[in-house]
A protein has these predicted regions:
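Surface-exposed short loop/turn segments
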Residues: 65-68, 82-153
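Individual transmembrane alpha-helices with interfacial aromatic-anchor signatures
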Residues: 150-162
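Intrinsically disordered, low-complexity segments enriched in polar/charged residues with Gly/Pro
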Residues: 15, 55, 99-102, 147, ...
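Short coil/turn motifs at beta-sheet boundaries
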Residues: 29-31, 76, 99-105, 160, ...
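A structural "domain/chain start" motif
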Residues: 2-9, 14, 18-60, 67-72, ...
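Short capping/connector residues at structural and topological boundaries
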Residues: 27, 33-34, 38, 75, ...
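Short beta-edge strand/loop motif at the mouth of beta-sheet-based domains
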Residues: 74-83
Length: 177
């Protein structure tokens, strides 16, 4: 074997045994954990139906991992994810020359926990996950805020945040961080 082959082979062998894996794809969950219940999250804010979007995104993210059956109830399951949306805010962060709001920061606070039903013990919890996204109005009018533009961009920001939230929560649960 040449020196070049040895220098190539040694690092490759070292990496083979290092336990490297993609972040967000590990699982510390017990082998018996096959069915995950994810009932609709609570919502203590005046924003109606936002809990449906966030709950659905968490369900989809768990299902995308491929090894769990996800159901919308907390009975007859091995583990359960519960959450409560406790705060939502939208605030202007950018303005036009006429001092009209052009860019908004939308944020949401969600408390979420994962419980092992069989062992009756909480495996992971974060009482105040905070997610934020900024969005710009496509064309603010010269007389003020265009409500339809605002609501359309708000929905898009909410959709992005709910996807980020779901990935973060499921990865944290799977890896117990």
């Amino acid at each position: 074997m040449t020196r070049r082959e040895v220098l190539t082979l040694v690092p490759a062998l070292g990496l083979a045994g290092c336990g490297y894996s993609l972040a967000g794809r590990g699982s510390f969950l017990p082998a018996y954990m096959q069915t995950i219940g994810i009932p609709i999250f609570g919502n203590t804010t005046p924003y109606q139906t936002v809990e449906l979007l966030f709950t659905e995104k968490v369900r989809i993210e768990f299902q995308s991992r491929g090894q769990y059956t996800v159901i919308p109830v907390d009975t007859g399951v091995d583990g359960v994810v519960r959450g409560t949306i406790s705060g939502i805010s939208a605030a202007p962060v950018g303005f036009t020359d006429a001092q009209l709001a052009r860019r908004f920061r939308f944020s949401i606070v969600v408390g979420v926990a994962f419980e092992d039903v069989k062992q009756q013990k909480r495996l992971w919890e974060n009482p105040a996950l905070n997610f934020a996204d900024e969005y710009e109005l496509a064309s603010p009018s010269s007389i003020g805020l265009d409500a339809s533009a605002f609501l359309g961009q708000e929905r898009a920001a909410m959709d992005r945040m709910s996807s980020d939230f779901a990935r973060t929560v499921v990865s944290a649960i799977m890896e117990a961080f």
